[in-house]
Amino acid sequence: MREKGPAFEHPQQVSIDVSAGTVEVHSNDGNGKEKVTTEHMKLPPDLANGMLFILLKNLPPGSVETKASMLVTTPKPRLVGLAISAQGEDIFEISSEKRKATHYVVKVELKGITGLVAPLLGKEPPDIHAWILRGDAPAFVKSRGPLTAGGPIWQVELESPVWPHQADAK
């Protein structure tokens, strides 16, 4: 996974090898030099890095709460928990047709001492909100949350394409 560009205060590239239990983080040391951090960790089978929206699309309708894990890098790798719960349905429109999307809230659960101290210091990660269109082929509709630890809240929405009419198309 690569985090680079104006949205990321601390650019980094992360490689995760679950079977070997190896996490490698390439980051900047603050002086322009590359810093490589390698950790050997026991990684859980429910690791959701890079697959959160795929996971949400595959949750059965009516799920009460689902737990998963995520690896965060600051740049030191550490595991956090994800508590995923459906918050009902919201109505939206595509081409003037009303549809319902399941609204999910993903809470990041910090572990250990960090999890105890973060709320006292106002450093709890914000919730991630995601909307998934249910059906035979579930689809991502919208998300709102940070793209990286400590980053700003971003809203990403599905944009319906509009194709030009071509008189000579056959």
Descriptions of predicted regions:
Residues 36, 51-54, 61, 103, ...:
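A general, composition-driven signal for non-globular sequence regions
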Residues 20, 31-32, 49-52, 61, ...:
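Low-complexity, compositionally biased segments
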Residues 1-46:
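An acidic-aromatic
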Residues 49-57, 91-95:
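Short acidic/polar alpha-helix capping motifs at helix-coil junctions
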Residues 1-20, 63-170:
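Acidic, serine/threonine-rich low-complexity disordered tracts
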Residues 25, 39, 43-44, 50, ...:
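N-terminal secretory signal peptides
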Residues 26-30, 53-60, 100:
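Short, surface-exposed secondary-structure junctions/capping segments
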